[in-house]
Structures are given as C-alpha cells and as structure tokens.
C-alpha cells in the first residue's frame, strides 16, 4: 500500500495491515518526539484545516500534530469566515485551497463532503467528520489507546456503553475490532441497541458479541469500557431519558465490581455519563486517550505526506 | 527603488520596473521552493494578517506565502474578534499591532483604510483589498500568470469578459497592461462597458483597444480570456440579467472557435460564468492562477521585509 | 523559586524577587532577539491560546512572543468556535487541550476561571484576564516599561489618572509598586477615587500616597503619568461624565507644565482620555509600552516552559 497522497475518508477503507501501519507509525513518532523534543518530518509542509463546522478539540489535535512534526498550519475554524458565503461550490473551494497547502483536513456538516473533497483535490484529504461525528481518526486513536494500554488488542473483553443505535463512533470502532480477536459487550437501554445489521455483520466475521441492558452484570468481566454520551435529544420522552440516564452513569459504586485492570474510555466531550469522581481512579484513561490523538494524527499526516 | 519597508497599496504606485522586479522575484522564489522544498528567507519574521472583513482565499494565500518563506503568522479573520469593537481607532489598532510583527497585510471594508494604515505604521503594509475587491496583489498574480504561461506578455491579445463597469480587478489589470505591448478586447453587455475615461486613458497610452458585446466574434483571436463574475445584484431587471448571463457563459460550445493556445483566467470565486465542463480543458488555468498567488505574495513579502 | 511548570494567575502571587526575575529575563530576551533576529528557546513547544472572550491585542501579543521564541501556537479567538457550546465543563476543556500543548494562556469572562484552569492542568497556565481586565502580564509589562525608560523604578514620582475605583489595572500596578520606593499620585474625580482599603494598604507598606482631583496641580512633579480609560457606562449621569471627561483629557495644554522627562503610559485601548496630538510628543510612550508586552510575555513563557 502506497501511503503518499492517500486520502483518509472512512475506516472502512482500511485493511488490517493499514491499521497496523498507522498504529506502528504513531508509536514510533510518539517515542521519537519524547526522545528528541521536536521532529522535522513535515518541515516546510503546510496543513490546511477546513472546518466548515466548529470542532475545537479535533482541530487543535490536528494542528498540534502538524506542529509536532515541524510543519505549518493555515485554515479556518468555522464556515462564517470562509468564502463559502459568496456562493462558491465546495469543489471550487477545495480546488482553490489545495493550491496553498500540502494536505487538507476537512470537517463538514454534510455527509459525503469529505469524499467529494478527496475526489477533487490532488493533495491528500483527511476526514475530520462529515455529517455525523464519525471520523476515521477517532477509531484509529481508540485502537491505538487500547493497544498502548494493554500491549495488544487480541484477547480483550471490550464493552461499549451508551447510545449504540445512533453513535457512529461505536459503530466504527466495533467494525474495526473485527480485525482482532476480542469479545464485545454491547451495553445499552433497549431503545438504543446496536442496529441488527451491524450485530449480524460482527458475528458473521467471527466476533463473540454479548448484548445486555445492565452494566452491572458485565462490568466484572471487562478489560475496556468504552462510554459514549447518550444524547438526550434523541429521546421522545424526557421521563424515559431520565430513567435510562441514571442507570448508566459510570461512578465509583458501579466500579466496585470492576477488575483492577479495567480501562474506561470516552471519545469526549462528556456530560454526565461518567461522574467526575471517576477521573482520579486508575481506570480513567479518557484524557490519555485524548493525548493519543496527537501521535495517531502525526502518523496519518506523515504517511499521506510521504515524509516517513 | 528600495523595496525594504515599502508599502504595497495600489498597483498605480508601481512602475514597470517595480512590476518586473516582483515578477522576477516570484519566479526565482517559485523555482527555489521547488528545488529546496523549504525556504528560510523570512525565518524569525512575523506577518500580521488583519482581516476586518473575511476573505478566506486571500488570507490563506498570504499565510501560505509567509509559511513557504519560513516565517510565522498572527492575526484575525474577521473584525468581530478584534478589539475594534471597543471603539478603538484604526490608527491605534495599527500602531498597536505593528509592535507585534514585521509586516502587515490588511483587508478592510472602507476605501482608503489600507493607505491610512500604511501612513501610520512603521512596518510595511500590504493592501489585501479595501472598499472594493481591487487589490494590487491580484493584478500582480494575473500578470505573473500570463507571463508564466506564454513566457512573455508583449504581443498577446487579451480579452476581458464580464462586468467591466464595476469590476476593479479588470480596471487594474487593464491599466497595468499599458506597460506592455498588448491588444485588449473588452467584451461586455452594453450596460457593463468599461468606463469611458479608462478606455481613453488606455488608448492615450498607445494600447489598441477593441470593444464588443459578443464573445463569439473575438474568441478566435484571443490568447487570454480573463473572465469576471457578473454580479446579478447590479442589474435593475432580473430578465435583463438572465438574457445577458446566458450569452456570456464560457462553455465548451463557445470554445469551439478558440485558438489552441487560448488560456482562460478568472480571479475567482466564480458562480456560473464559466461552466465546470471547461475546467478539464487545456484552456482552463484559473486554479493554476490561484497557485501563482503564492509565489507573487512570497515575492512581495520578501521584498518589503528586505530579506531577499 | 522554581519557575518551570509555574502558573501565572495573579500579580499578588509574585514576590519582589519574582518580579525582578521576569524583568531581567525580559531584558535579556529583548537584547538577544535584537542581536540574533530569531530565538529558538521554545522550538518544538506549543502554546494554546484559549480566548473564551475576544481580546485581540492580548492574544496577538502572546502569539507574537511565542513565535519570537521559535515556538508554535494553536487555539481559538472566541468561545463560539470552541466545544464549550456542547455543554462541556471548563475543567474537561482544560484537561483536553493540555494534551495538545506545553503551556496554556487563558482569557475567560468569569472571575476565577484562570485559577481553576491552573488547578486542573498539569501544563503551566498563564492568566490573560478573567472577569475583569486585570491580568498579571499587564502589570509586569508596565513595570518593565518604567524600568526600561528610567533605568530604575526606585525614586520615581508616578501618577495614576482616571478611573481608580473600578480599574483593576491601576490597582494591580499600585500594589506591585509597593515593592519599590516610589511616590504615588492618585488623580481622579471624587466619584472614582481609589478604594480606601487599597490606599490604606499602600500607606501601611510605607508608600507615600497623594490624592488629588486636579491633574494640573501635580503634573509638574511627575516622572510617569499612567492614564486609564474612564468608562462612560459607570456614570449614573451623562452630564456628570461629560464634565469629568473634559477636565481629565491629557492634551498639549495640560502638558505645558510637565517636566521634560515625563513619560505618559496607557494600557490601551484609549478612547479620548489622551488627545492624539500627544502621540508625537516625547512624553508619549504608550505604543512602546505595547511593544514591551512582547519581551515580558516571552520571559514568562520561557520561564514557565523551563527553557531558559
């Protein structure tokens, strides 16, 4: 697989070998950065971050990654300051901006926008989210985090908790995990179960999948608990939401039954699905997970720029 | 002419020698950048981009140019995030910001703002548009593009198409072209003809100027067709606009009569005055023209910073 | 005092030795920058500027300082483009952003926000204003300016003019000046006198403090006149404001009685409390004062990053 010039649009475009390449490159870059303090792989290169809708954490993570590689950044943080307002097509905007840079990171409210940008641009395009919150770099940093914490992904028992129906983050992660030998525990209220076709796909690929509505029943088995925000606005009935909400908050009491090695992850931002009291336990790794976004994005930038 | 510390406010301040210096410096920097990948002329220098009104493409082009020279960038993309809101005068804002940087690029909705900024500031000021869309760097990149495509400007037949009445871009380009031995074809609907005083000025300076309302009549003669956006909002009558619009769209049919060497330019953004089907023809160079903005702005920055 | 990793939240946290360290480091960095053109103390380091409310001059000053040190900058200029909108706590935002950077500069509308950020973050946090316009770097650059102009602070007669009641900038400056042997002249309308408890505190610390409502009476004695904006909106009565306003404008007439060495300072932005005609006199140093913000912020960044 030639990485130079490659677009990164969906995790579905990645083979297991691709994923392993990204994880190994991220590990190497993280180590080199720690040793040397400053890398110069992307010296003289320019990243354009085109955020047609705001997403501070994702934008700052990519910009940090580019700077850590010694490169420069241009771009915009929201569409209101972009020339999109003048009625220009996305196609023309991309054809224009690519003249100013070596790689594009795009975030766009419309599904398919990143794919279109990739088709139009000659420089590589990385999808930082289009239409939903799903984006391939989140899944890659999730996998990187699991591997870094346990030294492996194979053999782990991984629980996904929360909104498994609409949450694209957990859909992508579950699909990517089929490359590995893991047991998957899907923990959600009835209303928010993982769609049937995804569960079937996971099982067809040989994955052991357990579904439950009660975290307490499975917490003792898990190596990883991946928590997602339950989005209140999805619920037709406020009372229904409130009942569900309480039963799913991860707090110290729930964790009494957890294994010592349990790691709790979250793509953030969180609202109340993890109580702040959990932050100081050895289980909480969600801020380390945030940190891991930087080496993973460094790896992707270095690979598609062809500088590593 | 000493370039170090010079302000770049209007193309009218430029002699032919000045223009040639910019074009030659741009050519040199473009070549050096290609050979070395990274230049360091502006290492340790800071550009402040003060965009009192948004203009993403112009801002990103300047920022890219500064980074390509190895320099750094600070600034703001729109006035709402600037301290202008606190009732500070433009004069004080400029006197303040110049303490933080080595060169200023300013875009401002009020005509004369860039000239005022230049008078106030001790660091050099480059006008990225004030009051109208005219700005000298557009004209310079237009000239650079023509020279790069043909190896010369003299002897060419250049058509300007569209709104020649209000379009400052074409006014500036036409005036700058009087330094060269070109034939100018002014193609526009009656309502949007080039103002009489400009046409007279061009002819007084010895330029051959032909005016027409019909692109088809002259397309076969042209080496360059410079297309501008016809701004719908200028027309008192929607029907009149629609009739005009159709007759002026550059598409494959119109291009059947064009010379092989014809190059089509556009300052962008475009709306529908060039059909996307033209993009893949050998005639379309408007995205290369966008790219040329970078070496031209690199040249200006390096010259006024006195680092080349 | 170990500076590496230290937070800079309030000038009240600073000993005289701390202040002297910052001033000496700023002087050294300003000299080195002049000699070498470009410093690399912060090469490979990343500053995150988190401006939850806009403050262009402060943000650009910090960003300039970081670039002058050879470092990189990420961040946002106003809260609307940040993920705060998704209901995330400030605590989580800080814990997240610190994963992307080596030092944080924060500006926040709520008092106490910077202190909270400092408690949460493992990277050093510098307060660029929270709740009021007071921030420690303003006071430090004011002291640096006085020392640079006179070679010393001890022995000077310093006047503070304007809104001494609400103006936190002058409160902080007055408090910091108790470390030095200065005479302080508090010049304000009756309604805007310095709060009693501050005046008493100053006197208890041995400072000679003179209060007056009439600039003309004391202008001839002063070495420094520090002017602040009188904020119209504080006045219950427009007529009262207008009367006060006129009597306090610093203009050429008022300056007739001033000593030759008088230096006029202002934290800016100004509205009309200093007439523009004063700008070109030898007394006006408020734009040099702006410039001094850069070496002072360079010093703070270098110190808390532990790179000097």
Swiss-Prot record, chains A, B, C:
GO biological process, one term: 'de novo' UMP biosynthetic process
Molecular-function GO terms, alphabetical: amino acid binding; aspartate carbamoyltransferase activity
Gene that this sequence comes from: pyrB
Function according to Swiss-Prot or TrEMBL: Catalyzes the condensation of carbamoyl phosphate and aspartate to form carbamoyl aspartate and inorganic phosphate, the committed step in the de novo pyrimidine nucleotide biosynthesis pathway.
EC number, UniProt record: 2.1.3.2
Keyword Transferase: yes
NCBIfam families assigned: asp_carb_tr, PRK00856.1
InterPro entries: Asp/Orn_carbamoyltranf_P-bd, Asp/Orn_carbamoylTrfase, Asp/Orn_carbamoylTrfase_sf, Asp_carbamoyltransf, Asp_carbamoyltransf_Asp/Orn-bd
Superkingdom per UniProt: Archaea
Residues engaged in binding L-aspartate: 86, 168, 229
Catalysed reactions, as listed in the record: carbamoyl phosphate + L-aspartate = N-carbamoyl-L-aspartate + phosphate + H(+)
PROSITE patterns: CARBAMOYLTRANSFERASE (PS00097)
Pfam family, one: OTCace_N
Top-level enzyme category: transferase
Keyword Transferase set for record: yes
The species this protein was found in: Pyrococcus abyssi (strain GE5 / Orsay)
Family: Belongs to the aspartate/ornithine carbamoyltransferase superfamily. ATCase family.
Listed pathway(s): Pyrimidine metabolism; UMP biosynthesis via de novo pathway; (S)-dihydroorotate from bicarbonate: step 2/3
Protein residues bound to carbamoyl phosphate: 57-58, 107, 135, 138, 268-269
Protein name (database record): Aspartate carbamoyltransferase catalytic subunit
Subunit structure: Heterooligomer of catalytic and regulatory chains.
Keyword annotations of the record: Pyrimidine biosynthesis, Transferase
SUPFAM superfamilies: Aspartate/ornithine carbamoyltransferase
């Amino acid at each position: 697989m030639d990485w130079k010039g490659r677009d990164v649009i969906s995790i579905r475009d990645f083979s297991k070998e691709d994923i392993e390449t990204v994880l190994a490159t991220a590990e190497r870059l993280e180590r080199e950065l720690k040793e040397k303090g400053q890398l110069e792989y992307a010296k003289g290169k320019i990243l354009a971050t085109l955020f047609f809708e705001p997403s501070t954490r994702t934008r700052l993570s990519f910009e940090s990654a580019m700077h850590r590689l010694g490169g420069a950044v241009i771009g915009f943080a929201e569409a209101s300051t972009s020339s999109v307002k003048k009625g220009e097509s996305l196609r023309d905007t991309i054809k224009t901006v690519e003249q100013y840079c070596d790689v594009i990171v795009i975030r766009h409210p419309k599904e398919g926008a990143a794919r279109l940008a990739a088709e139009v641009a000659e420089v590589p395009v990385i999808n930082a989210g289009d239409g939903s919150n799903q984006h391939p770099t989140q899944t890659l940093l999730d996998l990187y985090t699991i591997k870094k914490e346990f030294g492996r992904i194979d053999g782990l028992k991984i629980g996904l908790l929360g909104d498994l129906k609409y949450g694209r983050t957990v859909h992508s992660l579950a699909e990517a995990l089929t490359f590995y030998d893991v047991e998957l525990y899907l923990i959600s209220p009835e209303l928010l179960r993982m769609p049937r076709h995804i569960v079937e796909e996971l099982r067809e690929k040989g994955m052991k999948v357990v579904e439950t509505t009660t975290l307490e029943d499975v917490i003792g088995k898990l190596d990883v608990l991946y928590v997602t925000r339950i989005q209140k606005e999805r619920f037709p009935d406020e009372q229904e939401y409130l009942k569900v909400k309480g039963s799913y908050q991860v707090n110290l009491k729930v964790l009494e039954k957890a294994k010592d090695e349990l790691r709790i992850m979250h793509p953030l931002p969180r609202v109340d699905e993890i109580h702040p009291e959990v932050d100081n336990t050895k289980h909480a790794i969600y801020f380390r997970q945030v940190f891991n976004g930087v080496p993973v994005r460094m790896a992707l930038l270095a690979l598609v720029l062809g500088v590593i």
